[in-house]
From Swiss-Prot:
Result of knocking out the encoding gene: Increases frequency of mitochondrial genome loss.
UniProt main location, coarse: mitochondrion
Keyword tags: Membrane, Mitochondrion, Transit peptide, Transmembrane, Transmembrane helix
Superkingdom classification of source: Eukaryota
Protein name: Altered inheritance of mitochondria protein 39, mitochondrial
Taxonomic lineage from the root: Eukaryota, Fungi, Dikarya, Ascomycota, Saccharomycotina
GO cellular component labels: cytosol; mitochondrial membrane; mitochondrion; peroxisome
Subcellular location field: Mitochondrion membrane
Keyword NAD: no
Mode of membrane association: Single-pass membrane protein
Amino acid sequence: MWGLCKKHFPSNKIQVQERNKALKPKKSGSEHKTKQLFPVFNCKKKEKGVMIRFAILRNANTSLLSARSICLFTQAPTYCHVRLNTLNKSITTKRNSLTESKRHVHDGKHFFTTPHQQQQTKLGEIEEGHSPNIKGEDLRSIGQAITHQRNKRRKQIWSAIFGGIFGVILGYSLIYRVIYLKEQSFLPLFPSSKIRKLSTRDLKKVDVNQVQKLSKLRVLEILSGHDMIKEQYGVPLLDKDGNSPTLNEFSMWCEDQDPCVTGIVMEPDDKRDSSHTWYRIPFVCKWRITHRPISIRGTIDDLLNRIGLETADLFEIISPERVYGSFKYEYPLQGDSHALHLWFHGEIELDDDSLIVYNGKYHVDVKLQEIDLFRREKNGQLIQYVLYKNEAGDK
């Protein structure tokens, strides 16, 4: 028979709770940690409550307060009951929070996702480096870096393209034609004007003094037969000192019949004497800068000759060189494969307010194109009088 003394049973509720804590079995450290990490939601095996038998002696006097304490002690909840109640409360609070969050969602982007999942996605993006709170300066610096890299890459591509083209042209002109075939090669650089000054080599082939004298005689001959000159200046035409007028300025230049380009002429370094000024690369080649015309007809003839045809086999060209007064009958410079126009310009001063200006072309004889009189009138105006103009001539 089990029995309990009065001193072992508490008389109030606080003492009952303290007694329950004292009777609660202590858990080991490993079991306590595993229950914290992996909480048990469904306890299939419920811990049985402690059943205590009380036997009261017949002759013992037990008060009602002691009996009440014994009843409270026997009805105290176990640890498993308290744990299950706590877990049920936490699950119900989570469900209520999720339902409340779903009710308050009004954004279309959360139609298939919850705000909680969206926050997790944003956190993942931030961890990967895609932060939405990046400053504007950082974005601009990133954009500038990308633009700089693209421009650098574009420059490298274009540099490689132009470098390859230049290497192919230089290799063909210098290595193949000059060094291997021992021929002259011309490398064009940029287009040039048809009109250019006579070079030192050209001036050696043209008698400039003769052209100057002939042009002056032709001008005085035309002016002596002009009515305005006869009335206002008289015949023979004299200057302010009573002497024959003299030339104040005279110049000559040439004009090609075809478009011209400026380029580099390269030849094998054979050390022969030449009238041109050459720059030499020892044992490789010699080169100089010159102007050359681009003959379209000559280019077509060369292409047809390479495939065994001639121009007459395809079409007939009526060349202006066969017409009198054309380029064929202009002054041809010796050693050149093309004809040139030789132009001249002169000025004759009659007095302080009158100046004769003329220009023309030279071949075997002088052919004047235009003669003008520039005179300052009494009112101070400078007036140009056209005394002669060759309408049929080609300028």
